[in-house]
């Protein structure tokens, strides 16, 4: 982003030296208003081919997602004038956009000529060959190029040109373009603000990971969602209608089972949780990947002791035998015990023992005795994918963020 060149003209009597310094990129130095969250949007692109029976073939069309940052900012006085001037003059060009949630304070004075910056880099968006913005206010900043990243420091490609106080902040930065339309409502002759959206110029890669737990060869979602506000379950069918417009209509349930859509909300309260969530999203790659997703609800209630070695259990009557027996999406269960153990089983048969009890057979016998009081929850386990290629994280601070995912159950033969 910076220009640092020396031109030398070699004359017979003397040399003429011309030093040129400058910058090819301008940083966006107007911080967000943290009273509303800073939105990070990751967007993959998946080609989904659906068969008659609702089974799918899916392929990723992007190696890495596009990323978008969106936030509100407010200006007053000289800052307002500079913000409007910069938006006017540089609006169509590329900005160095600070990644606001990943900033950290220097903590100690950084002298001019420094090539190493002691700073916390763990789980922040610093990358070798990328940019960093040293910042104190919209008018006092320096854009630096990162040569390498260590756990507790950055090594710069060129020395700093100014001395920075301990209170200065340093942010990782990404090249981005602002949206083609920027609204700047003016509250008075001195105050203005608006909502600003930036699309990163290049996709951003991340190390994918789904966790260690698997079932039938596929990863399992093991983190519970945030129940504040609840989450919705929607059942939709691939129902074809034949209507000749002259008599009764004919319907064909092409898939035989509904596609369930569950919306789950997540509250991430540390950078480690944010990192694990991002790794999961990158492993799924939007609608491309799939994993086993529990309903996290009390779907079956144990009513009798399960003996060690038994391959069935008695559950409170809920219509499973009549309505669900063997259906894809309702034949796998997650059994959570009070001691922390989690068991995964496939239901292979069901019979009504009485008007209040159903006996369900499973594929793998239980290796120890389980009392009804030992069971915290029995939930259905569904193979599902994300229902959208775009996922947003709402950052309230650098360490706290919220997100939501909608899972779509799949027709499968696992």
Where are each of the predicted segments found?
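Feature for long, exposed domains in two main contexts
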Residues: 1-24
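Short acidic, glycine-rich loop/turn motifs
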Residues: 9-13, 134-138, 200-202, 335-339, ...
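Charged, low-complexity interaction regions that mediate assembly/partner binding
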Residues: 24-31, 36-60, 66, 73, ...
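Cys-His-centered catalytic/binding microenvironment captured across papain-like cysteine peptidases
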Residues: 25-41, 136-141, 152-232, 355-414
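Oligomerization/assembly interface segments of phage tail-like spikes and tubes
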Residues: 44-51, 58-77, 184-206, 237, ...
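Active-site-adjacent core segments of small-molecule enzymes
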Residues: 56-58, 249, 383
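Autoprocessing Asn-cyclization modules and mimics
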Residues: 74, 78-163, 207, 221-227, ...
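Long, hydrophobic alpha/beta structural blocks
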Residues: 243-247
């Amino acid at each position: 982003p910076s220009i640092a060149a020396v031109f030398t003209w070699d004359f017979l009597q003397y040399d003429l030296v011309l030093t040129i310094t400058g910058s090819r990129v301008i940083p966006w130095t107007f911080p967000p208003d943290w009273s509303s969250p800073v939105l990070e949007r990751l967007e993959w692109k998946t080609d989904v081919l659906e068969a008659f029976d609702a089974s799918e073939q899916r392929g990723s069309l992007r190696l890495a997602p596009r990323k978008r940052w969106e936030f509100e900012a407010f200006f007053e006085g000289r800052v307002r004038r500079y913000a409007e001037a910069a938006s006017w003059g540089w609006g169509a060009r590329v900005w160095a956009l600070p990644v606001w949630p990943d900033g950290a304070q220097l903590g100690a004075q950084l002298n001019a000529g420094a090539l190493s910056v002691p700073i916390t880099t763990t789980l922040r968006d610093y990358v070798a060959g990328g940019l960093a913005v040293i910042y104190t206010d919209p008018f006092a900043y320096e854009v630096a190029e990162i040569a390498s990243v260590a756990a507790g420091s950055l090594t710069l490609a060129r020395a700093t040109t100014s001395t920075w106080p301990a209170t200065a902040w340093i942010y990782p930065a990404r090249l981005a373009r602002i949206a083609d339309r920027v609204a700047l409502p003016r509250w008075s002759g001195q105050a203005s603000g608006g909502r600003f959206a930036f699309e990163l110029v290049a996709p951003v890669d991340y190390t994918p990971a789904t966790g260690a737990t698997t079932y039938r060869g596929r990863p399992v979602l093991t983190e519970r969602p945030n129940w504040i506000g609840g989450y919705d379950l929607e059942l939709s069918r691939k129902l074809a209608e034949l209507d000749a417009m002259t008599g009764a209509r004919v319907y064909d349930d092409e898939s035989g089972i509904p596609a369930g859509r569950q919306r789950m909300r997540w509250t991430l309260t540390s950078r480690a949780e944010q990192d694990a969530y991002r790794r999961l999203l990158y492993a799924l790659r939007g609608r491309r990947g799939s994993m086993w997703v529990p309903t996290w609800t009390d779907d079956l209630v144990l009513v009798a002791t399960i003996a060690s070695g038994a391959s069935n259990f008695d559950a409170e009557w809920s219509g499973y035998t009549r309505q669900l027996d063997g259906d894809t999406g309702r034949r796998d269960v997650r059994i959570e015990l009070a001691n922390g153990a989690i068991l995964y089983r496939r239901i292979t048969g069901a019979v009504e023992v009485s008007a209040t009890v159903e006996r369900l057979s499973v594929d793998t016998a239980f290796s120890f005795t389980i009392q009804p009081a030992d069971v915290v929850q029995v939930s259905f386990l569904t193979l599902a994918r994300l229902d959208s290629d775009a996922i947003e994280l709402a950052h309230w601070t650098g360490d706290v963020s919220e997100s939501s995912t909608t899972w779509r159950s799949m027709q499968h033969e696992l």
